[in-house]
């Protein structure tokens, strides 16, 4: 099964904050203010509505505000997603195909909109403090618009304010879980990471 673009496109701005906070909402708001660049590894698990595992994947990502990111799936399939600040490029190595979209159209009212760029989180999302479970503080973000692909997003922060887990709950009962490790925050990233030119011979589809 190929990895679904709808899960990839919402995750490029997922970063981490190292500031200590007492609540999930406080950590989320601090993340919005303080996370400028990030490099991290991720493990992804997709669960169906019966909570059976239907897909796993892993890879790495880099991010630089505003709107620049590089998201690499290494297993089970090679896929590359690059945001250059204006467009998002999806490159599927096996299919020899590139899909390109405008950044605003691709993100919309989504988890990326929740985490990207400005601090006006509650303009587009209802935030609910879930509380401490184990050593993780959880916050729930629900889109105010009915046009969102996702019903809700759960964000889990450590007690030190580091974002470790994100769960995307879609409108069909499917859940995509991302767990993050090897976080490097606010380091200078090479500009070339956020540029993409389609390889020769691949099909390019504009949406």
Curated annotation (Swiss-Prot):
Record Gene3D superfamilies: Lipoprotein localisation LolA/LolB/LppX (2.50.20.10)
Keyword match Signal: yes
CDD domains cross-referenced by the UniProt entry: LolA (cd16325)
Signal peptide: 1-22
Annotated InterPro entries: LolA/LolB/LppX, OM_lipoprot_carrier_LolA-like, OM_lipoprot_carrier_LolA_Pbac
Keyword Protein biosynthesis: no
GO biological process terms held by the UniProt record: lipoprotein localization to outer membrane; lipoprotein transport
One Pfam family it belongs to: LolA
Any one of the GO CC terms: periplasmic space
Chief localisation class: periplasm
Subcellular location: Periplasm
PANTHER family, per the entry: OUTER-MEMBRANE LIPOPROTEIN CARRIER PROTEIN (PTHR35869:SF1)
Biological role stated in the UniProt entry: Participates in the translocation of lipoproteins from the inner membrane to the outer membrane. Only forms a complex with a lipoprotein if the residue after the N-terminal Cys is not an aspartate (The Asp acts as a targeting signal to indicate that the lipoprotein should stay in the inner membrane).
Subunit structure of this chain's protein: Monomer.
Protein name: Outer-membrane lipoprotein carrier protein
High-level lineage: Bacteria, Pseudomonadati, Pseudomonadota, Betaproteobacteria, Nitrosomonadales
């Amino acid at each position: 099964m190929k990895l679904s673009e709808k899960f990839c496109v919402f995750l490029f701005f997922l970063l981490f904050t190292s500031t200590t906070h007492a609540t999930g909402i406080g950590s989320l708001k601090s993340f919005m203010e303080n996370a400028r660049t990030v490099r991290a590894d991720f493990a992804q698990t997709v669960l169906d509505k019966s909570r059976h595992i239907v897909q796993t994947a892993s890879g790495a990502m880099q991010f630089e505000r505003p709107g620049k990111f590089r998201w690499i799936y290494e297993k089970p399939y090679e896929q590359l997603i690059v945001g250059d600040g204006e467009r998002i490029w999806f490159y599927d190595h096996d299919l020899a195909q590139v899909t390109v979209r405008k950044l605003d159209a691709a993100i919309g009212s989504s988890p990326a909109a929740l985490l990207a760029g400005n601090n006006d989180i509650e303009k587009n999302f209802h935030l609910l403090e879930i509380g401490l479970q184990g050593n993780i503080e959880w916050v729930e973000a629900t889109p105010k618009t009915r046009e969102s692909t996702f019903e809700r997003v759960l964000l889990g922060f450590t007690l030190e304010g580091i974002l470790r887990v994100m769960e995307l709950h879609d409108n069909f009962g499917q859940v995509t879980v991302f767990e993050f490790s090897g976080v490097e925050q606010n380091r200078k990233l090479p500009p070339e990471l956020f540029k993409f030119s389609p390889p020769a011979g691949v099909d390019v589809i504009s949406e």
